[in-house]
Design a protein with these regions (language model features):
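Conserved ABC ATPase signature
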Residues: 136-140, 144-146
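A short, proline-enriched helix->beta-strand linker immediately N-terminal to the Walker B motif
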Residues: 155-159
Length: 233
């Protein structure tokens, strides 16, 4: 079974806009996949379907053996415990330190303090933040803030890491460092990575699988691909 298995999926919003149209897509465990396309093509809707922010109008969306389409709202937490999500906006809690931001989710899950410390320190080590654990978000750079977000996303060792424009607010040099870190996590932890991006240079340099959407339709799916999206619209 594929880790992500989407079949004949449609997402039509109440205003009649079709964001995803007859999408069939399979992603193996441990793959690194870029999702590309012009603004409004359905990229963000696709990843929202994966973490059940949206439900498909029609079709199947399976993530780690869970049928997202049939998942009751009260059971969404079971899916999200298998996921880590990194957004363009850092969404860090300003009054908490780096350590506390990464630990916050585990504390809410009722994880024992000794285990929290072990997991948090491991995540901070992976992301190169051990020297920043006592800092507050406003005391570190944008790139470091995004590293905190990545540490927070991987602290529970998720099977899937979803990155929605993770370099959108960063300069080119820092963007490359962040993607290099995500690639390292993919290789070392075996985490499946699905990354939405507009960054042509990063996509072209990575030579990973590239999926392109246009008006909600899959128009390209290439292993070791390059950025082919037409952003003229």
């Amino acid at each position: 079974m594929k880790f992500i298995d989407i079949r004949n999926c449609y997402k039509v919003y109440k205003n009649g806009v079709t964001a995803i149209a007859d999408l069939t897509l399979a992603i193996d465990k441990g793959e690194f996949v870029f999702i590309t396309g012009a603004s409004g093509c359905g990229k963000s809707t696709l990843v929202k379907l994966l973490y059940r922010e949206e439900k498909p109008t029609k079709g199947q969306v399976m993530v780690g053996g869970i049928n997202v389409a049939k998942l009751y709202n009260s059971r969404v937490y079971k899916l999200r415990r298998k996921l880590g999500i990194v957004f363009q906006d850092f969404k860090l809690l300003p009054k908490l330190t780096v350590y506390e931001n990464v630990a916050f989710g585990l504390e809410n899950l009722g994880v024992k303090s000794k285990e929290i410390k072990r997991k948090v320190m491991k995540a901070l080590e992976r992301t190169g933040l051990l020297e920043k654990i006592k800092c507050f978000p406003n005391e570190i750079s944008g790139g470091e803030q995004q590293r905190v977000c990545i540490a927070r996303a991987i602290v529970n060792e998720p099977k899937l890491l979803i990155c929605d424009e993770p370099t959108g607010n960063l300069d080119p040099k820092t963007s490359k460092e962040i993607v290099k870190l995500i690639s390292k996590i993919n290789k070392e932890m075996g985490t499946t990575v699905v990354m939405v991006t507009h960054d042509k240079e990063i996509v072209n340099s990575m030579k990973r699988r590239v999926i392109t959407l246009e008006n909600g339709v899959l128009t390209n799916d290439t292993m070791k691909g390059s950025y082919t999206a037409d952003e003229s619209d």
